[in-house]
Amino acid sequence: MSNSTPMSSQGATTRTVTPTSQGGSRTMEVRPQPVLRLSAPSGVLRLRAEPTERRRIQWAEDVVDNEGMGKKSSKVCCIYHKPRAADESSDDESSGSSSDSDSDSEVDNSTARPSSGAGGHRGRAHKHDHGDCEHGHNHGEGSGKPQKRRQRRKPSPNAYEKMPKVKK
């Protein structure tokens, strides 16, 4: 038989009396560890963010939201060409560069050009009616001196291959 009786007025001390096989009894006393309680008020923890002086992206005034979603992006996913006035030049820089230049630094003004296969017959013989002009030369019908061919220039990179200009 087991008998449990609280014995102390101070807490939950428990005494257990257990009969043994020899006719006696065993008494076991269990005392819980005291809990230390502070009566001081608990502190307040205040979390503060880091100063906002870190580097952050600031878009220039002329950056365009080219996807129409209210976001500005540095990724080239849509090619946007800023509208220009009719009398404004289509070159980004001054007209100092020649279109015949073989230079890699040529300004790509992103205008459509005919490919060399279809319609790119610049400098070749042409046929149309000049009437009887009677001025002693042919109009490119193929007879006479062969015309001097221009040397092909390197193709300029497209908008996806070209690095954006950095304004200082």
From Swiss-Prot:
**Can you provide one Gene Ontology molecular function annotated for this UniProt record?**
protein phosphatase 1 binding
For this protein, the record's InterPro entries field holds:
PPI_Ypi1
Q: Which UniProt keywords apply?
A: Nucleus
Composition bias of kind Basic and acidic residues appears in: 47-59, 129-142
Which compartments does it reside in?
Nucleus
This chain's protein is named Type 1 phosphatases regulator YPI1
Q: Which domain of life is it from?
A: Eukaryota
Family statement drawn from the similarity comment of this UniProt entry: Belongs to the YPI1 family.
Q: Where are the transmembrane segments?
A: none
- Keyword rRNA processing in the entry? The reply is no
Question: Where is this chain compositionally biased, Basic residues type?
Answer: 146-155
Function as written in the Swiss-Prot or TrEMBL entry? Regulator of type 1 phosphatases which maintains protein phosphatase activity under strict control.
Any GO CC annotation of this UniProt entry = nucleus
Q: Where is this region: Disordered?
A: 1-168
Asked if the record carries the keyword Nucleus, the reply is yes
Which stretches are tagged as biased composition: Polar residues? 1-25
